Amino acid sequence: MTQIKYDFGSGRSDPATFPVAALQAAATQVIEEQAEALTQYPGDLGHAGMRAAMARREEDREGIRIDPNHLLLTNGSMQGVTLTAEALQENRGDTVLVEEYCYPGTLSAYRSLKYDMVGIPLNEGGMCPDAVERELYRLHKEKRLPKFIYTISTYQNPTGFVMPKTRRLQIIEMAKHYGVPIVEDNCYADVHYDGPLEPAFYALDNDPNQIYLCSLSKILAPGLRLGYI
C-alpha cells in the first residue's frame, strides 16, 4: 500500500502544530477563574465570552463591528451548514444553489434534508455570475426560487478557487433582486498566507439575508469542534 505523506482530502491539521501547552494553560486558567460558570448552561447562543472573542476576531479580519448577540456557537462549521439548511427549509424538495463541485459533507447534509440541489459552474473566480443569474431567473419563472445560495467563496473545496470582490458584489445584487439569502461558509479563510484576503460577503453589504459560517477547525484542531454562525 502506498504511504501518503500529505493527505489533502480531509482538511486535517498537522498534529505537530497543536498548541498543547498553551491550551493546557488556558484550560487551567478557565477552571480556576470560571469554575462556577462552567457548572451552568451557557444559554442558547453559547458561551458569552467565546462569542465576544469570535466577534472581535471577525472585526479584526473584516473591519466590521459584530454584535456578539448575533453570533451562535456551533459544533464546528458543519453544524452551521445543517442548522441553516433546516432553518431556511419550508418543504422537502426545496431548491438550493450550490457550487458544481462542492464539499461532500455539505452535499450529504442537504441530501438528508431532501433538498433539490442545482449546481452552478465554476471557473478560477468561483461561482460563475452568469450561471447564477440564469438559474435564479429560471427558478423564479418556475415559482420555485431557491431557499438560499451556498458558497465557499474563499479557498473553495475542492477547487481552491477564491472569488474576487467584484464577483461577490455581483452575486449579492442578484440575490437581493430575487430575495434569496446567501449562506457563505468561510471555514478555509484562515489558511491564507500572502496578500490581502478577499472580504466576506457580509462585509460588503448589510443585507440581513446574508448568513455567515466560520470555524476554527483548520487553524486549531478539527476535533475541538468550534464554529459559529
How does the language model describe each region?
Residues 23, 206-229:
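Conserved core segment of the aminotransferase class I/II
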Residues 10, 122, 215:
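Active-site donor-binding loop signature of nucleotide-sugar glycosyltransferases
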Residues 4-6, 41, 155, 218, ...:
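Short, flexible coil/turn micro-motifs enriched in small/turn-prone residues
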Residues 32, 37-178, 183, 189-204, ...:
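Conserved core of the PLP fold type I
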Residues 1-45, 49, 56:
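N-terminal "arm"/small-domain region of PLP-dependent enzymes with the aminotransferase-like
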Residues 11-14, 153-156, 218:
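Short glycine-rich anion-binding loops that position phosphate/pyrophosphate groups of nucleotides
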Residues 18-22, 161-162, 194-196, 223-225:
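Short aromatic-enriched loop/helix-cap "lid" or pocket-rim segments at secondary-structure transitions
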